[in-house]
Regions:
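Mixed-charge (Asp/Glu-Lys/Arg
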Residues: 1-213
Length: 213
């Protein structure tokens, strides 16, 4: 092979590049995002040591954003230096029109119902959940559902028993989520960035962009 043939061979474009130049509309210009995943044991450790780092507020913000993804999107954040406070709730729903709720695609979206949420990092989760439910009900605002989210592990039988007791006592449905629920939902690919954005896990997330097509 002489030099001219070799130079011609080297200069020839790849078939994909040639076709892309001729028919760009037939090729995707989307980007694929690769990011490192969060280790479950590391995230579990961070949930367990939130109080040591005074990250109660960051955890509350994270839980609200996670609940917006997994339970209902129309949650309003509480204001003030420490959320909750006189409002008795850490977050609650705000009313929206049925047209907006329809486009959410959720079967149980509270369009006009009032749902209240309590978030806790306390070790005595049972006392805290009971106190939160009583405080929320004392407002007389007509809440029809209460969610308590704890950063602690809770035995299933104990959680179910307290849910039933509180629901029966106050006449509304009470749901309690613990650390297992938080871990399972957070580690889903669609939710991992929430923990990173809220500065919960002390890790560096490496991003890599790749052109698809």
């Amino acid at each position: 092979m002489d030099k001219e043939q070799l130079a011609s061979k080297i200069a020839d474009p790849k078939p994909q590049d040639y076709l892309r130049a001729r028919r760009p509309e037939q090729f995707s210009d989307s980007l694929k995002l690769h990011e490192s995943t969060i280790d479950r044991s590391m995230l579990e450790y961070h949930f367990d040591t939130l109080n040591n780092r005074s990250q109660e507020l960051e955890f509350e913000i994270f839980v609200r954003k996670l609940c917006e993804r997994e339970i209902c999107p129309n949650l309003v954040p509480q204001t003030g230096p420490t959320a909750g406070g006189d409002g008795k709730t850490d977050t609650e729903t705000y009313p929206v029109s049925s047209q907006i709720a329809f486009f959410w695609g959720l079967n149980e979206a509270p369009e006009s119902q009032r749902w209240a949420f309590g978030v806790s990092t306390q070790k005595d989760w049972k006392t805290k959940c009971t106190k939160d439910v009583e405080s929320i009900m004392s407002t007389g605002r007509g809440y029809v559902r209460i969610f308590c989210v704890s950063s602690r592990f809770i035995k299933n039988s104990l959680r179910a028993q307290l849910q039933d007791d509180l629901s029966k006592k106050h006449g509304i449905k009470v749901t309690i989520y613990d650390r297992t629920w938080l871990l399972d939902k957070t580690l889903q690919p669609k939710n991992q960035h929430l923990a990173i954005d809220c500065r919960l896990p002390a890790i560096q997330c490496q991003l890599k962009l790749e052109v698809c097509g």
